[in-house]
Every structure is written in structure tokens, then in C-alpha cells.
Design a protein with these regions (language model features):
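Short loop/turn motifs that connect adjacent beta-strands in outer-membrane beta-barrel proteins
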Residues: 22-33, 69, 99-109, 136, ...
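Short glycine/proline- and aromatic-enriched beta-strand/turn motifs that initiate or cap beta-hairpins
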Residues: 24-80
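Outer-membrane beta-barrel translocator domains and adjoining extracellular loop/strand segments
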Residues: 46-53, 83-89, 122-137, 167-177, ...
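Surface-exposed loop and membrane-interface regions of Gram-negative outer-membrane beta-barrel proteins
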Residues: 67-137
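Transmembrane beta-strands of outer-membrane beta-barrel pores
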Residues: 40-46, 76-80, 98, 114-121, ...
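Cleavable N-terminal export/targeting peptides
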Residues: 1-33
């Protein structure tokens, strides 16, 4: 989580984790399907900043999708920012996805929506390492997003995605925030694994408020993450 424009780049490999996805071919009820996932990861990182103080995290979520393209997602994870009173993140997203036919050969999938990031038990003010923080919304914030995904772009089964996220009062009262990202995924032969790479640029208005909670680990804007799932 972040919201300012520093000129630093970081590269990394996503920490190992295991994920179980349920109901791949979920039955439909009145046009609605439900899918879920459970994951255990050695470190929960969000846009380059650890959300679990470099410790393991347990995560899980459900998505309810309608045949029209509308969906509702519920997701949660254990978190640890090194402050008293918060150990759980709960996110709720409401969105819409469909195909945008640009030509006979170009039809990307678009995904737009709004998401609420909630942090149960997080207070509106606290002190970390002698640095005070006082924000009207605590750690909670809302964000709107949009993404285009181009399937089978370079290889069969691959995908290129470009997206943008915006919040008018980002995490820890760090004010206006923009996040731009591009990603690529492709199957690894016939192994059943998928390789993914992504680059993101985070622009914040108020980096100082974020640094209090993130413990100063915010000197990064462009992030390259390579992971296998």
C-alpha cells in the first residue's frame, strides 16, 4: 500500500506459498456461481510493502459471480503492522467484467469496480517507533480500479494485462493515490504451473503518514514480481 512518487526501483521474487482453489467448475444458481480459495504464504506483500512484518500469513476468500458479468468478492488475511489492535484485513469488492470487442481479432476483457480495504481493530491514531499517526479513517480506505486483459497475445494461453487504481484518501491517511501496473502470465510447458511477472508504479501525495505504519519500508515505486502458481 502506498501513495507518493519516489524514484526507486525494487526487484523481488514472491515468497513461497500454497494455495487451494475450490469449485473450479462451480454449479450455477440463478445465474450465480461461487468460487473460493485458501492460501498460506510465508510473507504477505501488497504493492511491495510487507503486510505481515515479513512473517507468514493465512488468507482466504469467496467470489460470487453473475452470468451478466457482475461479481462480489470477499477476501481476508492475517496482517501485522507492528502496532497494537489490528491482526486482520477484510476486503470487499464489487465489480463488473465483460469482453470489449475492438475488432474481429482483438477482444480484451475489461474489469472495473470498487473495493473497500478494512482493518479490523485498527485505531484512528497510534505511535510507532516514536512517530505519531492520526488519521480520520484509521487504516481503512476505498479504491476504484479498472483493468484490460489481452488473452493469447504472444503465446497460446498467455495474457497481458494493464490496470489503474485510484483512491482519494489512501491507507493511513496518505491522501490521493494512483497505482499503474502491467502484467504478463504464461503457462510453463505442460507442468500445470503458470509464470507471472508484473511491474507497478505507485504515486502518493503524503508519504509520511504511510511511513509510520509501513515502518519506513516505502522507498519503492516500480515493483517487479515474479511468481509461480
Amino acid at each position: 500500500m502506498m501513495k507518493f512518487a519516489l524514484k526507486a526501483v525494487t526487484f523481488g521474487v514472491l515468497t513461497a506459498g500454497s494455495t487451494m482453489v475450490m469449485a473450479e467448475d462451480a454449479p450455477s444458481f440463478y445465474g450465480i456461481t461461487a468460487t473460493g480459495s485458501v492460501a498460506a504464504t510465508t510473507d504477505y506483500r501488497f504493492r511491495g510493502v510487507t503486510q505481515s512484518s515479513n512473517n507468514p500469513a493465512i488468507q482466504g476468500g469467496f467470489t460470487f459471480s453473475h452470468k451478466s458479468g457482475a461479481y462480489l468478492s470477499l477476501w481476508g488475511s492475517s496482517v501485522d503492522f507492528g502496532v497494537t489492535g489490528n491482526s486482520t484485513e477484510t476486503d470487499v469488492a464489487l465489480g463488473y467484467t465483460n469482453t470489449l470487442k475492438l475488432s474481429d481479432t482483438l477482444a480484451p476483457t475489461y474489469d472495473v469496480g470498487i473495493i473497500h480495504y478494512g482493518y479490523i481493530g485498527a485505531g484512528h491514531s497510534f505511535d510507532r517507533n516514536g512517530i505519531g499517526y492520526d488519521g480520520k479513517n484509521g487504516l481503512d480506505f476505498n479504491e476504484v480500479y479498472g483493468k484490460l486483459t489481452f488473452a493469447n497475445s504472444l503465446l497460446k494461453g498467455d495474457a497481458i494485462s494493464v490496470g489503474v487504481n485510484y483512491s482519494d484518501d489512501y491507507w493511513a491517511n496518505s491522501k490521493q493515490f494512483w497505482y499503474f501496473n502491467i502484467g504478463y502470465s504464461a503457462p510453463i510447458a505442460d507442468t500445470g504451473f503458470t509464470g507471472l511477472a508484473s511491474v507497478g508504479y505507485n504515486k502518493f501525495r503524503n508519504k509520511d503518514a504511510l511511513a509510520v505504519v509501513a515502518g519506513g519500508l516505502v522507498k519503492m515505486i516500480a515493483i517487479l514480481i515474479i511468481k509461480w502458481a
